[in-house]
C-alpha cells in the first residue's frame, strides 16, 4: 500500500468509551453479556432456518436467516476488539487493521440496510398482494435479491476504503471512538478533505437516508392497507410492524445522523455507533422471533445429536 508507506502514521489510538478503569471493567462485563447474547441468538436463528426445509423455502425466513448471519458477523468486527481494549491501557489499531474494520463494517452494514429494505418489500407483497405472494417472491427472485444485497454492500465498502486509503496521515492519530470509522479517520488527514467528505456523505449518508425512506414508505402502505381492509390478526400485525420499525430506526437514524452532515467530531457519535454495532444485532433475534410462532416451534424441535450437529426432530 503506497499511501500507507508514505504516511507517518502507522497506527491509530482509540480513545474508547471511557478512561475510567472501574467504568471500563463494568462496560467489559456488560458488553461481554451483549456479545454472548448476539452470538447465541443469531446463531440459533441461522441454525434453525437451515435445519428446517419449510423455513428455508419461505421468503421471510430465508431473508431472516441472512439477516441473522450479517448481524453475527457485524458484531465480530468491532465488539471483540472493544472487549480487549477494556482490559488494557493502550488502545491502538494498525493502519491496515483500521482499513479492515472500515471495509467489513461498511460491507456488512450496507448489506444489512439493503436486506432490511428487501424484507420490507417482502412484507408489503405478503400483506398487500397475498394471492400472488408466492408467485412474486419465488425462490429465484429471493436468491437474486440476496445476491444484490451482498454485491451492493461490497461495492459500497470498496468505495469507502478507496477514499480513505488515498489520504495522507502525518499528524494526530487519536480517534474518539471504540473502532475505526470513516468520519473520524478522514478528519485526521493532513490535507483539505472537503471533496472526500462530500463523496462519503453522498455514498453513506444518502444510502442510509434513501433506504430508510423506502422502508418507511413500505410500512406506511402496509399500515394503510390493514386499516382499509380489516382482517383477522390485524392488531398483531400492527404490533409486529411497530417492533420492526423500532429496530430499523435504531439502525438508520444513527447512520443518517453520523454520515449525512459535515464531519465535525461529536462525542455522542460513538454512543450512536453502539446502536447499529451492538444493540440492534442483539435485539433483532428477539424482535423477529418473539412473536413468531413458526420460528419458536421450529426452535423447540431442534435436537443435538452426539456428534454436535443440530437436526430437526
UniProtKB/Swiss-Prot annotation:
Disulfide bonds join 98-190. Belongs to the G-protein coupled receptor 1 family. It comes from Homo sapiens (Human). Residues 1-25, 81-101, 160-196, 260-270 are extracellular. The chain crosses the membrane at residues 26-49, 59-80, 102-121, 141-159, 197-220, 237-259, 271-290. This is Olfactory receptor 4Q3. Glycans are attached at residue 8. Pfam families: 7tm_4 (PF13853). Keywords: Cell membrane, Disulfide bond, G-protein coupled receptor, Glycoprotein, Membrane, Olfaction, Receptor, Sensory transduction, Transducer, Transmembrane, Transmembrane helix. The lineage of its organism: Eukaryota, Metazoa, Chordata, Craniata, Vertebrata. Its main location: membrane. Residues 50-58, 122-140, 221-236, 291-313 are cytoplasmic. PANTHER family: OLFACTORY RECEPTOR (PTHR48002). The gene is OR4Q3. The keyword Amino-acid biosynthesis does not apply. It is a multi-pass membrane protein. It is found in: Cell membrane. GO terms for cellular component: plasma membrane. Odorant receptor. One of its GO terms (molecular function) is olfactory receptor activity.
